[in-house]
């Protein structure tokens, strides 16, 4: 649901930029998305009828709504700079996992699981190898941890990279 919300929002922002003859840049796209969602966290985070809302109530993580409100700061600051590097797609994902309070991880594994995964991602980021990435994947499967929010943010980074370039 988070990826659909985010990509729909970014497509709407893209359309508005085109309609207003504004340049399509990552900054313009994300700034407009932030304007379009200003206050969404405060307005919508009172309920607990989704995993994201329940995690917000329990841990304070803002999830996809917070990312949108921030103009997808995690995508711009953590993922996008990695994409041009060798193994950039892996490094972008690891950078996101290492720093984002992923609501899916919190839902499945709590703060302890999130801290474990973030620590592993930071270590792997600095000493990257495909085999170590595969090992982390197996460990996540064994622990029933899925950084789905970070995967959504990576998809957003790919989308932004493709429409900007």
What do these predicted regions represent?
Residues 14-144, 161-165:
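Phosphate-rich cofactor/ligand-interacting catalytic cores and adjacent structured alpha/beta frameworks
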Residues 1-11, 143-158:
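Conserved phosphate/anionic-ligand binding catalytic regions in large, soluble enzymes, centered on
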